[in-house]
């Protein structure tokens, strides 16, 4: 689970105009995402929405510099946008005021920020995250949460509670 306070702190400490949460992925997954090519400091130098072929290969980066093992970085050499962003207020307002027709971050807003010369940073997150943008993906992600004894994500973490509507009884937990 992502600690958004760390994400925001990273954005502030780097002085970025825009920070994009990134997930290391393999080539098969990469074609379904917006990908970013970064330098050693995590500055986003290029952003492409769902590249294929040679365009995809050009987006590979050394993900070991973001804390992945050498083996894992070879398996997952692409940084996929998670669709989670932190903007400086001025940057967001300037981008939207100058381009009121822009509606898609990956296809329009982020490339525009790059072309303007704004400072874009990546925030690499290497923990549980699922893209649930389709009904099938949503179904599979929910089904995976039933895996026992250890699902890929646990809702029972005292350090990071998930708040829902007020209840006076804890939720059910089934353990085999």
Predicted regions and their residues:
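Left-handed beta-helix
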Residues: 65-75, 87-176
């Amino acid at each position: 689970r992502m600690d958004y306070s760390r994400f925001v702190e990273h954005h502030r400490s780097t002085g970025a105009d825009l920070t994009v949460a990134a997930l290391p992925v393999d080539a098969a997954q990469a074609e379904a995402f917006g990908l970013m090519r970064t330098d050693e400091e995590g500055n986003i130098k290029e952003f492409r929405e769902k590249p294929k072929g040679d365009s995809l290969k050009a987006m590979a980066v050394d993900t070991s510099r973001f804390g992945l093992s050498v083996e894992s970085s070879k398996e997952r050499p692409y940084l996929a946008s998670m669709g989670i962003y932190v903007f400086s207020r001025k940057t967001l307002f300037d981008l939207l005021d100058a381009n009121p027709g822009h509606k898609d971050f990956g296809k329009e807003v982020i490339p525009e920020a790059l072309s303007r010369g704004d400072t874009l940073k990546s925030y690499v997150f290497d923990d549980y995250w699922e893209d649930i943008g389709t009904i099938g993906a949503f179904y599979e992600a929910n089904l995976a949460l039933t895996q026992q004894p250890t699902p890929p994500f646990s809702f029972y973490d005292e350090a990071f509670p998930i708040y829902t509507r007020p209840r006076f009884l804890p939720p059910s937990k089934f353990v085999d």
